[in-house]
Structures are given as structure tokens and as C-alpha cells.
């Protein structure tokens, strides 16, 4: 997949560099990013095959758990074009404050 919007996660990591657990979160994010870039997801089921705990939303967005359930990443996946757009990255508490269907 072509992944766009990585600057959202990078900005989050830069802003929270000293926080407990952020290094582990960054490593897990980088692992997720490597998988996403190699992926050829053509259907939501393809996402679920590689990320069984991902949530496929009605809006077509996908919510990925990063570092267990400590962090969330919301992405829009354009299956036909092979593009994944990161729309949100933050803690689970941050995630609870946004509308994942519209962000």
C-alpha cells in the first residue's frame, strides 16, 4: 500500500518523546507501517487477515491497535488505488474523544 499521513504519527511521537511507553509504541507503529507498506489489501477481509483485531468501520475507515490497546491509529483505505491514509494517531483516551467515522 502507499501510506500517506505518516507525519501525524511522527508529530505525535515528537511531542510525547519523554512519555512512558512511547518508545515501545513507536517500535510497534514502525512494525505496523512496514507491514502496511508491503500489503496489497484489496478488500477489508485482507486487512483482517493480517490484523485480526483491526476494526472495519461503516465509513470504510479502519482502526488499528498499536502497542496492544494503548494507542489507536485510524486510517482510510482506498482498496482499488492501493492507498492508505492515516487520519489519526493517539492514545486510547485520545481516540475516545474523536469520531472515528468522520475524522
Locate predicted features.
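Basic, Lys/Arg-enriched alpha-helical interface segments
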Residues: 1-70, 78-83, 92-103
Amino acid at each position: 500500500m502507499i501510506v500517506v499521513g505518516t507525519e501525524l504519527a511522527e508529530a505525535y511521537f515528537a511531542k510525547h518523546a519523554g512519555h512512558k511507553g512511547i518508545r515501545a509504541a513507536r517500535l510497534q507503529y514502525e512494525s505496523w507501517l512496514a507491514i502496511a507498506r508491503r500489503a496489497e489489501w484489496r478488500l477489508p477481509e485482507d486487512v483482517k487477515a493480517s490484523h485480526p483485531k483491526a476494526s472495519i468501520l461503516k465509513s470504510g475507515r479502519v482502526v488499528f491497535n498499536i502497542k496492544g490497546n494503548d494507542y489507536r491509529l485510524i486510517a482510510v483505505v482506498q482498496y482499488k488505488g492501493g492507498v492508505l491514509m492515516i487520519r489519526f494517531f493517539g492514545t486510547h483516551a485520545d481516540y475516545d474523544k474523536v469520531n472515528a467515522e468522520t475524522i
